Amino acid sequence: PAVIIVLVTGIVFGLVQGFLVAYMDIQPFIVTLAGMFFARGMTAIISKDMISITNETFMAWAKMKLYLPFGGYLNKKGVMVYPYMYPTVVIALVFLVLAFIMLKYTKFGRSIYAVGGNEQSALMMGLNVRRVKLKAYVLDGFLCGVGSILFCINTLGGFVEQAKGFEMDAIASSVIGGTLLTGGVGNVIGTLFGVLIKATIEAFITFQGTLSSWWTRITIAALLCFFIVLQSILAMVKKKN
């Protein structure tokens, strides 16, 4: 029941925010920022303390390892060791593939690109821009619910301050992966590479040992600024040509 409640809550959040953006013409940044503050405030009302997950199914999924049939090697004891993945990673990759197919090969996916690129052109093409926006926000809310479930499986708990600042990490990863902030350009594969680049930087700084963890934020911020400036330059060149 808890999983269903989380998914439904995500859909409701997406529906409300999508309605405010698409039909009330409120700025998306304001709507989503207010929604984030509202959701975080509601979690604080529910509990300000850490809530541990003791459900046996969740705990089993958190400990489960899916071994890959390739890439094995002999350890020092002469035992063959194979690489493995956690179920949450596999589920995330499945959703990644589905999102790629949806955006690239379906009418709804192409409509999202059209609306993101130029709303007026999309209207002239006969697209129902408001409906496309609403559907996109509902889908986003559902995926946020899925992501929160996977995150809780990994951490086996929930806390009001959990995932604080992840919204900026998501924006940075998307921009580094080639998504234009002006809309209409980007794909989930590029975003995946953006996430991997960010994770590589974090791992390097962590294992380097002599650098403060704040250097991660500084490096990501510098990369974000660089790619935004690069996008602006490319847009100016394209417009000039």
Which residues make up each language-model segment?
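Hydrophobic core segments of alpha-helical transmembrane domains in multi-pass membrane transport
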Residues: L7-G10, M36, R40-M42, V89-M102, ...
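Transmembrane alpha-helices
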Residues: I30, N128-C152, M168
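Transmembrane helix-bundle core of multi-pass membrane transporters
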Residues: I4, M24, P28-T106, V132-L134, ...
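Alpha-helical transmembrane segments within multi-pass membrane transporters and channels
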Residues: P1-F37, F193-G194
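Cytosolic-side transmembrane-helix boundaries in multi-pass membrane proteins
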Residues: M124-R131, I201-N241
